[in-house]
Amino acid sequence: MNLSEIAYRRVVVKLGTSVLTSGSKQLDKAHMVELARQMAALMRSGVEVVLCTSGAIAAGREHLQYPALPDTMANKQLLAAVGQSQLILAWAQLFSIYGLHVGQLLLTRADLHDRERYLNARDTLNALLANNIIPIINENDAVATNEIKVGDNDNLSARAALLCDADLLILLTDQKGLFDADPRTNPNAKLISQVEKIDDSLRLLAGGSVSGLGTGGMSTKLEAADIARRAGIEVVIASGHHPDVIKKVVAKESIGTHFSAIENPLESRKQWILAGPAAQGSLVLDAGAVKAVTEKGRSLLSKGIIGVKGEFERGATLQLVDQNGKIIARGITRYCGEALGLIAGKHSDEIESVLGYDYGDAIVHRNDMVVL
């Protein structure tokens, strides 16, 4: 691969469970070594690679010889705890064939929620890459009680792409990409090769995972793509079993579904607001506030709030929703939930008289907000 012909310098590759198991109940080591070969070739060409890998629970089942366990959170975490060591060992052995070392990062939502921990994770990623070591990222399923759920590693890979300032995110799955209908049930379904905008009509095309081993579906890949492209990162969803898929995607061959990055990506802090903290509550906005926030780029004022949901403190990340429940923005609140319950719908000049203090007119300042 000719370095001068490669458009990307830092790539995140996400491998779903269905890709790693090839549809079986165990890791497909032969296919994993083929994927490792492609990533190693990129590294030799000067392209830095970050691997976000699923498969810990599948590896745990295999290592324990498929125990008959009740489908509980504790048992999923048991399998993840056993399987994670087997998974990282497998990758370390496979990459060693090509003279490469790996470093493991197990993350939870808490690592992304806290700004300092978020930046520390970024520094670790950059240090590994600077020393020609492949970072291997997975959700810390053994301790993350609300993280073993649909979409977790798809979204995690997008956040990893933001963390390391990647310019390409490759989501490899058991499908060839995004189709205009479900290809599993509709033989006339056509592959969508290019996406410039992710909207509600596109989200309706997404389906769920059918492997039974993974936690992601096409809808979560759209969520991940939307996060990444807002940060200026291109995204490709493609089949992990297409020959030389990683090499071909990086070479910009027409394969899978390509999502263009937005022209004016979010700056670093707004990337964190979008992808870091979990929303701790929501504010329901009237039509005027929705227009002011989404069309005029203004801060959210108390007058435009008609509902407060959740218990949260000042500085929490919130979702801003319209009266139909559609999320229109995310942002950091300057007032706690209890205070907002008292001043919602009131004019800004009434805040101090109602609360006895005033943190400013803006409930969510436009500089602390990401419009979706």
Swiss-Prot record:
Keywords: Amino-acid biosynthesis, ATP-binding, Cytoplasm, Kinase, Nucleotide-binding, Proline biosynthesis, Transferase. The keyword ATP-binding applies. It is an enzyme of class 2 (transferase). Residues 280-358 form the PUA domain. ATP binds at K14, T173, D174, T215, G216, G217, M218, S219, T220, K221. Belongs to the glutamate 5-kinase family. This is Glutamate 5-kinase. It comes from Shewanella oneidensis (strain ATCC 700550 / JCM 31522 / CIP 106686 / LMG 19005 / NCIMB 14063 / MR-1). The gene is proB.
